[in-house]
Amino acid sequence: MIEVEITQEMIDEALFRASQVPALKNSDTNNHGTKIAALSDLMVQKTWGGRIVSDISYDFDWISPKYYLFEIKSKERNVEPKPWYNCSVKEYNTQQKCDYYLFTSIYGDYSRGWILGYLKKDEFFDKAVFFNKGDVDPDPRGDKYVFPSNCFNVKVEQLNCK
């Protein structure tokens, strides 16, 4: 896991990028997540280079310097991510044409974020556990998280990170 300091310049750019995105049909966050996603894209690009393409592709958000296609999945958090926290791909998003899923978290005040790690798409689904909307995470280390939508999940501790 890599912690990243978020600058005001990154926040301003993310807010602009988010303002250009139409309302999302299946948003669990009333499109607040669009801001978090834009900030996550920038955080990854500023840390590892590559190119953000989320504005032109539904299937992936970032092209790495080695030309791999990454779909970035982001969550807002009010605490530093723990190894047992879930990294999720919603059931309706499983057809995206990416090489990897990359997971990030953004602290609620936008002061910092974390690149949690990544998995190849097929490896993600080999390791993932499926939960239905309303299911409670059975992991005894957690706080009985209730899943807001049907999704596939791995734990942070299962991810690869540079």
What role is predicted for each listed range?
Residues 1-68, 73-162:
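Nucleic-acid endonuclease domains
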